[in-house]
Amino acid sequence: MELYFSWLILALAIFIGTYAFVFGVLRRVNEWYHCGKLGEMKHSLPPGDMGWPLVGNMLSHQKAFKSSEPQSFIYNLFERYGRKGIYRNHIFGSPCVIVVAPEACKQVFLDDENFKMGYPTSTNKLTFRGSFITASKEGQKRIRKLATSPLKGHKAIVVYIDNIEEIVIKSLKGWASLDTPIEFLTEMRKATFKIIANIFLGSSSDSVIGSVEKHYIDYAHGLISPFPINLPGFSFHKAMKARDMLGEILQPVLNERRAMKSDEQKGRKGLIDLLMEVEDENGTKLDDLDIIDMLISFLSAGHESSAHIATWALIHLHKHPQTLRKAKEEQEDIIKKRPSTQKGLTIEEIKQMEYLAKVIAETLRMTNLSPSSFREAEADVNIQGYFIPKGWKVLVYNRGVHYNPENYPDPKQFDPSRWDNHTTRPGSFIPFGGGSRICPGADLAKLEISIFIHYFLLNYKLELQNPECPAEYLPVPRPSDQCLAKVVGFK
């Protein structure tokens, strides 16, 4: 009996000792390492904790995004440290500060002097390979401005309406002709990819577009990989291989466009042609590796946002019949006012889609394709009285901003009417980022979405096969069945 109690006491002592070591010592290693070196300034850091050695809080972050409540990660910070809107943390392999207070978000976005792009290691390794990354800040800014000029503003994007309409009308007609349900999101991605490839590449065969789309899926899964390990079996390794394959596919396209230019062949210019022409402040042009990397990035962002937001908007509309009816009536009114001689949409008509714009804004707020905008402090910075050390990442946490009840009451409810007479506080609506580095394709994406929904509401309905299908949030929010549905035309 005494032996039994001795073993019991020993086991209990080992358990208590292990617990004390794990949570009293091991759990604080990250905190001691990253914050201890700051001396007295560590007391001016935002509230929070640095998680476990090496992995930080990445496991709890991933757990939240694999659940039905991805915003639970930021809600947990609210509960533990109050609604201060700024927290220290350690995710994506780096010490960081998570920002959700609108005023702080605005400061980070507008301060180009103290904050640069600060993508996770996985994104940097997959995205930047050529000389562009070594150019000066002003050189990068100039190249980015020139390269993205065809994508910004109604005057620039109006030239794409006819092309978008053609692909939208043909796609919807084809889907409606099928007797069996389709993975609507998958088909939407194919359609928007055709649109973006046509705009960016000038023109390209279906085989090229299909090959790029095929390898893009593996590439996208590795962009924000929590553990960028380049070994077989890891998503980052598959993404690296996919990136190389994308380069092999796009290089011949680049060579072809260059040959057409040297032979003075006429052809509609795409972004690829513009990227071949731009120069930095020293007159240096982008090398092929830079051009291919930029094309992959633009192709990636350009079709993902349009396809997913249009799909989620239609899902929300079909789950809210009154909202659907109101959105449809607006589109019908636009058609009724149209001259009999006019064929197709005009930019003026798209500007009249005020209610649809609210539907799209609400879908953007709820979906959050990118959970964060990534920056890095280039100097010691003060944000709302808190110290941000040089070299730390700063994550403007979009989902935390958009699901904060202080910014949007009842944030889980789809409610386009919340945008009626709504004055958006700077930094409180940031689906495309903000500041000088705001997503250059935002206007083009909203144009695509508007045209898709316009033609869909007028001519089709969506019969969801699994109306209560749960959502998945990695790598981006989507229905787990890819929105399995029938597209039914009105007779």
Curated annotation (Swiss-Prot):
Gene transcribed to yield this protein: CYP88A37
GO molecular function: ent-kaurenoic acid monooxygenase activity; heme binding; iron ion binding
Chain's role: Monooxygenase involved in the biosynthesis of limonoids triterpene natural products such as limonin, a compound with insecticidal activity responsible for the bitter taste in citrus. Catalyzes the conversion of luvungin A to (1S)-1-hydroxy-luvungin A.
Cited InterPro entries: Cyt_P450, Cyt_P450_CS, Cyt_P450_E_grp-I, Cyt_P450_sf
Cell compartments where the protein resides: Membrane
Keyword Iron: yes
Distribution of this protein across tissues and organs: Expressed in maturing fruits and in juice vesicles.
Main location: membrane
UniProt keyword annotation of Lipoprotein present: no
Similarity comment: family membership: Belongs to the cytochrome P450 family.
Enzyme Commission number(s) from the entry: 1.14.14.-
Domain of life from the UniProt record: Eukaryota
Enzyme class: oxidoreductase
Sites where the protein binds heme: 439
GO BP of this protein: pollen tube development
Protein name per Swiss-Prot or TrEMBL: (1S)-1-hydroxy-luvungin A synthase CYP88A37
Gene Ontology CC terms, in alphabetical order: endoplasmic reticulum; membrane
Pfam family, any one: p450
Recorded catalytic activity of this chain's protein: luvungin A + reduced [NADPH--hemoprotein reductase] + O2 = (1S)-1-hydroxy-luvungin A + oxidized [NADPH--hemoprotein reductase] + H2O + H(+)
